[in-house]
Amino acid sequence: MPSTLIHVSLALLLAAGLLGTEFDGRSVLVVAAATAVPDLDVALEPVLSGAHRSVGHNFVLPGLVLLALAADLRRGPDSLLHRRYGDRGVTLAFTAVVCLVGAGIVPDLVVGGINAFYPLHDAFYTVDGRLFYSTDRGWVQTFVDLSPDDPEPQRTTSNFDFRTVLDAEPTLGVEDSGGGSGEAGGGGGSQRVERLFPVAMTGFRAWLLPLAAFVTGTRLWRARRSANAGVDGGDRA
């Protein structure tokens, strides 16, 4: 699983791209702290089985934070956040939430899985697969399987838990599963070469695509808005 350092590193890249010239030492501390919050659930593992990747690694937590921010900002001039930190504080708060989700939670969703809707719904989910173009098969994706084989039992906190640094032998996770069968060898007929053009061969790499698009689009939008504001200011002068 990605380490906390990896999560924070990705978050700082996100924040640097989103905040631009507003990215400073305070931003680093706020973003790093927000991104590290999910991994604190490892401390609850000894007293709450399945806490890791559940208590902190879910979409309910950032949802509640967004609701709290929205409720505060609806107060207008009486907004505690805006009154104390101004527009910059509001921007930093929402950036921290984006980093919490984009760098703190989703990377674990695509590497091993998380209890995405805990405690509202106790079930671990993993988004993983491959996307590529094949000269034989055309576009191939395995992220969404519309005709799955016999489903495996749903992972929950009662039958699955991730090994952590608190365990003697940390692993990616443990669960009861049957032995997998190897793929059969090739058949007869003429040989031909299949050429693959990789796009995203793992869930983590697939997540980087929309993430990069989001950061790039946001930075371009903010740059355009700043440029337009400068032009309008010059016209008034």
Predicted regions and their residues:
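N-terminal membrane-targeting hydrophobic helices
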Residues: 1-237
